[in-house]
Amino acid sequence: MSKFLSQAAINTLRNTRLGSRQLVRSFAGISNTRNHRGAGHQEWGCGQSAERGLLELRMPVACRRSMFIQTQDTPNPESLKFLPGVDVLGKGNTYDFPHGTTAHSSPLAKLLFRVEGVKGVFFGADFITISKQEGAEWSLIKPEVFAVIMDFFASGLPVLNDAQPNADTEILEDDDETVMMIKELLDTRIRPTVQEDGGDIVFMGYEAGVVKLKMQGSCSSCPSSIVTLKNGVQNMLQFYIPEVESVEQVFDEADRMIDSEFERFEKNLKTLKQQGPSGGGPH
């Protein structure tokens, strides 16, 4: 019976056109009531992105058109969302490049990683999220990112070569009913809200009542990512799918190893800079 109600509720969600934050407030309040935690509501999502900047950049004369690139703050101070005014991957599609070593499948990502201070690149439907290294200044990074984006879209090259965007919520033949409902809810209501803040949530698996998710883009290192998962995503999934007991964030072991190597490299580089030209070389 619970599964029938869950599917019916999801069908209702499909046909309901509520603002994402309004929907979140409703579900957070319902979840609190259901769990007998008292009145009130909790907001979820990576946060609210309010500030926008607009810069007009002129294309080369041969292109005979202008590109307007907007920037949008994210809840993560280390990440910034760039909106070029054209499709990047198209509706609902995302692709994450957490490190420069993962950019081999995208000419655009390769160019963006050449900008000093860029740590991560994330592509969405119509936006690009840039995550910077700690201590790097946006005032120095932004002009170079603007130039790279402008030149790239003027070139007509494909954003991705052979790689395919995320397809983690695609319904598979061997998915049971619970997994299908989890994917449906993630795809229709949760991911669009997170993507508004320059990130994404990827379904990694479901086992013994535990939903495993991976945060990407601005959400991967966002201080509020755990709050997003527990107070937002978990509450919503539990309300519509009683079989869900908890939500856990997972990390790729390869990403951890690359992070460790990158931090070691940065530390060595800072040491060399502090030593200066006279530090150890022949005079």
Swiss-Prot record:
Coiled coil location: none
Cellular component terms per the entry's GO annotation: mitochondrion
Pfam annotation, one family: NifU
Single annotated GO MF: iron-sulfur cluster binding
Residues of the transit peptide: 1-65
Physiological role: Molecular scaffold for [Fe-S] cluster assembly of mitochondrial iron-sulfur proteins.
Entry similarity comment: Belongs to the NifU family.
Region feature NifU, mapped onto this chain: 182-250
UniProt entry tagged with the keyword Mitochondrion: yes
Keyword match Ion transport: no
Cellular localization per UniProt: Mitochondrion
Main location: mitochondrion
Protein name, UniProt field: NFU1 iron-sulfur cluster scaffold homolog, mitochondrial
Residue ranges of the TM segments: none
GO biological process, one term: iron-sulfur cluster assembly
Record organism: Drosophila simulans
Residues that hold [4Fe-4S] cluster according to the record: 219, 222
Signal sequence range: none
Keywords: Iron, Iron-sulfur, Metal-binding, Mitochondrion, Transit peptide
